[in-house]
């Protein structure tokens, strides 16, 4: 009788121990994953790839790591905190795309509208659709490629003044609309202007009231260089790892809907959770956003992207990348990746979603230049986050 009770107690104890061991094992990968990501991020700053860094990694909707590293201001020796605010460059474009899609859902515009409906005097406006502009297949020349852009970028302009400026450049078109793919900041700046015309409000207000506030992005705004912003980070140009200089000035009226947002890594992770969680757009709109753009001949934009990258000798030229609305869709060793980077004077950013892995990675850097900045650091963090070994 006592032996039976003892056996039952031993069995129960063994079961409890097994459950505790299982629970410990279940928690361990999260802790180990956070430590592994932390090591990658910390070493990037130590090796001089960025003066400062902000990282947010989420898995299954929960934070694995939200942490900041290094310096927000090299001259003042101010450390980066999780509330420090970085410019995110072209990550802005997906917000512009979503604003257009929301207006389309409300029947206030169509993505098949010709640009001439909103900017009648812009060159070739009768031949270009809003959707082609979203896909970078409009052929509109990229104004940031202008040789004098550094000087042009110092001048504050209204949206209409900027659209007029783009339309009067010596070159306005790279190719016939719909026949090729070429990244165009001009197209997305103009799309920001379309949002303003249709919504009847400044782009900053549209973003704030329809996107940032509802999602709880408390440290995010369309940037204004004259505004005093708590936690604003100083940006740097990098000639090489560890060799930084203060970045050139740019009026944030110049990037507009193509690249003017400031944010934090944690806020961008919130954005991805809301966007891919179906809380921002209708399912059909989100699906359209992720659908590869097509050229007039029926080929996807990815064919043209591959040719362009190959001709430029760019890394990853042999990997298939497609482009939807302000999002690249690709594969990372069999893992579907939806992403966009950003680069603007002094800053670089990378925001990625791995839908099947349920992993979000946001990396913000206050550096841009050769072998510095967010891109390569984010690549390494992403591979750790989705369980892949480092690239050789």
Predicted regions and their residues:
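Bacterial N-terminal signal peptides
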Residues: 12-21
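Active-site-proximal loop and beta-strand segments within enzyme catalytic domains
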Residues: 71-185, 199-201, 227-248
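Bacterial N-terminal signal peptides that target proteins for export
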Residues: 2-12
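Catalytic loop of the DD-peptidase/beta-lactamase superfamily, centered on the K-T-G motif
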Residues: 3, 26-67, 199-201, 205-209, ...
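Alpha-helical scaffold elements that line and support the substrate/ligand-binding pocket
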Residues: 55-57, 61-62, 87-110, 114, ...
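Short, glycine-/polar-rich solvent-exposed loops and beta-turns at beta-strand/coil boundaries
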Residues: 49, 224-229
């Amino acid at each position: 009788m006592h032996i039976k009770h003892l056996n039952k107690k031993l069995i129960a104890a063994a079961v409890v121990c097994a459950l505790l061991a299982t629970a410990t094992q279940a928690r361990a990968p999260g802790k180990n994953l956070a430590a592994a990501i932390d090591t990658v991020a910390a070493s990037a700053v130590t090796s001089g790839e960025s003066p400062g860094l902000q990282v947010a990694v989420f898995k299954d909707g929960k934070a694995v790591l939200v942490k900041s590293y290094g310096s927000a201001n090299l001259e003042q020796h101010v450390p980066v905190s999780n509330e420090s605010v970085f410019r995110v460059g072209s990550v802005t474009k997906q917000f512009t795309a979503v604003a257009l899609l929301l207006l389309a859902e409300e029947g206030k515009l169509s993505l098949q509208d010709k640009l001439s409906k909103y900017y009648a005097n812009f060159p070739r406006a009768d031949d270009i659709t809003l959707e082609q502009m979203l896909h970078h297949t409009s052929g509109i020349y990229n104004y940031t490629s202008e040789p004098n852009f550094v000087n042009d970028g110092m001048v504050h302009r209204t949206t209409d003044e900027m659209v007029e400026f783009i339309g009067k450049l010596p070159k306005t078109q790279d190719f016939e609309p719909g026949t090729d793919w070429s990244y165009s900041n001009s197209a997305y700046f103009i799309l920001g202007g379309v949002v303003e015309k249709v919504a009847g409000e400044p782009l900053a207000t549209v973003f704030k009231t329809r996107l940032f506030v509802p999602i709880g992005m408390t440290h995010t705004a369309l940037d204004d260089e004259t505004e005093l912003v708590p936690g604003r980070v100083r940006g740097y140009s990098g000639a090489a790892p560890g060799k930084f200089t203060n970045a050139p000035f740019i009026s944030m009226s110049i990037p507009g809907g193509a690249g003017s947002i400031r944010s934090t890594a944690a806020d961008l992770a919130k954005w991805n959770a809301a966007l891919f969680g179906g809380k921002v757009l209708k399912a059909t709109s989100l699906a359209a956003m992720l659908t590869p753009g097509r050229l007039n001949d029926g080929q996807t934009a990815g064919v043209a992207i591959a040719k362009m990258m190959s001709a430029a000798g760019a890394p990853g030229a042999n990997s298939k990348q497609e482009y939807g609305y302000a999002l690249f869709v690709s594969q990372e060793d069999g893992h579907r990746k939806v992403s966009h980077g950003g680069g603007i004077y002094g800053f670089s950013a990378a925001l990625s979603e791995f839908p099947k892995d349920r992993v979000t990675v946001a990396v913000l850097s206050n550096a841009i230049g050769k072998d510095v900045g967010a891109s390569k650091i984010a690549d390494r963090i992403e591979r750790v986050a989705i369980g892949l070994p480092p690239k050789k």
